[in-house]
Amino acid sequence: MSGYLLFKSLHLIAVISWMAGLLYLPRIFVYHVENFEKDQATEIFETMERKLYNYIMRPAMILSWLFGIILIWINGIESFTYLWLQLKILSVVILTIYHEYLGKCMRSLKSKENSKSSRFFRIINEIPTVLLIFIVFIVVFKPM
């Protein structure tokens, strides 16, 4: 097996894991906000959020970046000249900012300082879906 295919496979596994977390964590926030007055439920949601964020999402994000950088290195630095790759990297930067924003939301929920509604979390839950669709199409078709 070539190194490129190995790292491409590892990159895909990490990205799928990261995306699963990015799609699921806001959904937990919805339930958390809707059950904010129930102490036992709140405690369960806080544990779920913390474990998902720290044990799955953060490592998956780091590995997605690491394996992606390795793939660029294997392909050669000149691959940075491809517009499709620049757009993909920009999209991944946006996903990373979104990831960190979810961490901020998680901390505000835990400290009872959250001002966001469950509807807000339902809406922002679509951000990674839109970016995922965009990334898949530009990577598969490499239009530019």
What are these regions (language model features)?
Residues M1-M144:
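Polytopic transmembrane helical bundles with strong interfacial aromatic enrichment
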